[in-house]
């Protein structure tokens, strides 16, 4: 299986990498949050752009991205607009979503973009090609904050992302029971052992699914999300606790 290298970080080998999400409404809070995050122990900075108020002003968005890049130049920067339909803060049209991601790619400020699988097949394929032409990696994602589908469906979605040439397929699902967590873990393992030729990220959300955020190295998830301050999704634990547990499991 091939790994994915972003800056000096190799994703897909060793302990799962820690991603943290920065959620800020304006330039001033981007700046203050960035300074606070700089002291934390994590591997990838995700900027959740859907929390940013001045979205229609592309110059303002890119000015904020520049602050993040300059404050943490060594950290891979993942640009993510999470749509309202997948649990994000704002709803925008598909055209605006694609344009925003293309602007991020064009800026040269971001290392990775998050691209939602169910944006539309043609738009997804074109945006992946555009990102790769500009040396930007793509995390292709799907989120369900209500339920966990059958393992076959989870695997089918991850394989579709892989077929669309995502660098890293990602799926996050809400469990309604502990057995749903086992379904997610079993699907992750089957994907990793039988189909994946690149790193994948999977997680079961909420308190019920916390084990999935810790056991990635066992079942085949290459990264996990932790919280510096406020969790960006239910079930995230603090980066310090997360690093401790990931290290224990890695060294066991």
Swiss-Prot record:
Inhibited by sodium borohydride. The keyword Lyase applies. GO terms for molecular function: 3-dehydroquinate dehydratase activity; protein homodimerization activity. The active site is at 143 (proton donor/acceptor), 170 (schiff-base intermediate with substrate). It catalyses: 3-dehydroquinate = 3-dehydroshikimate + H2O. SUPFAM superfamilies: Aldolase. InterPro entries: 3-dehydroquinate_DH_AS, Aldolase_TIM, DHquinase_I, Type-I_3-dehydroquinase. 3-dehydroquinate binds at residues 21, 46-48, 82, 213, 232, 236. Its EC number is 4.2.1.10. It is an enzyme of class 4 (lyase). One of its GO terms (cellular component) is cytosol. Changing residue 170 to A: Loss of dehydratase activity, but it is still able to bind substrate. Involved in the third step of the chorismate pathway, which leads to the biosynthesis of aromatic amino acids (AroAA). Catalyzes the cis-dehydration of 3-dehydroquinate (DHQ) and introduces the first double bond of the aromatic ring to yield 3-dehydroshikimate. The reaction involves the formation of an imine intermediate between the keto group of 3-dehydroquinate and the epsilon-amino group of a Lys-170 at the active site. Homodimer. Belongs to the type-I 3-dehydroquinase family. This is 3-dehydroquinate dehydratase. The gene is aroD.
